[in-house]
């Protein structure tokens, strides 16, 4: 109360006492809606390939990123707030906001690192023909909007579904999610199905 009354007593506009909103951490490389629409139009529409031969082990993930940190730990630090890490780079305190569902967590064990385009989905849309090095780069991509910290059970509910079958619980995140999905598919020249494209068009319409 004192903080709000003081500006009034001093004749200072109240707006000066209100701090600017804090920007939440976001993955890098998210395109504008217009760019995402252009990239979506450029993607090849094709029937989804087979899951035959797929294994997560074919996408070496959570590799070392220098020092004692692996990819998962780098994303936890990037996407968290006030993160404190131990000597092995594991977060011992801090918080994480999950944009998929709007939940905030204070234990790293409650957070998964989501592959925005799941590894199995990538396999079925072109990654089955990649080299192991290419699949490793995809699974640990810190440049494109492919990795983000989210609520663990929400990520598990998503599984390897595309946007035609799974969308973030928060409809307000549809736009951003679609932009990220399109950018990753475009960056890696992965195909999309007709149902997937229709879902993405609808989600981009919310932007």
Model-identified regions with their sequence ranges:
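Fungal secretory targeting signals
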Residues: 1-23
């Amino acid at each position: 109360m004192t903080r709000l009354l003081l500006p009034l007593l001093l004749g200072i506009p109240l707006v000066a006492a209100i701090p600017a909103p804090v920007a939440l951490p976001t993955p890098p490389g998210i395109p504008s809606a217009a760019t995402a629409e252009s990239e979506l139009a450029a993607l090849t529409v094709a029937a989804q390939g087979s899951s035959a031969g797929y294994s997560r082990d074919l996408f070496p993930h959570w590799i070392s990123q220098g020092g004692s940190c692996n990819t998962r730990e780098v994303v936890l630090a990037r996407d968290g707030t006030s993160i404190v890490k131990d000597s092995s780079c594991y977060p011992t305190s801090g918080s994480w906001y999950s944009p998929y569902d709007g939940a905030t967590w204070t234990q790293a064990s409650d957070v998964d690192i989501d592959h925005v385009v799941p590894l199995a989905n990538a396999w079925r849309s072109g990654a089955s023909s990649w080299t192991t090095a290419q699949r490793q780069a995809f699974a640990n991509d810190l440049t494109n909007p492919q990795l983000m910290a989210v609520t663990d059970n929400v990520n598990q509910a998503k599984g390897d579904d595309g946007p035609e079958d799974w969308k973030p619980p928060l409809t307000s995140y549809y736009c951003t999610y679609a932009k990220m999905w399109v950018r990753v598919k475009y960056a890696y020249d992965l195909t999309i199905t007709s149902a997937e494209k229709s879902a993405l068009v609808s989600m981009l319409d919310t932007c």
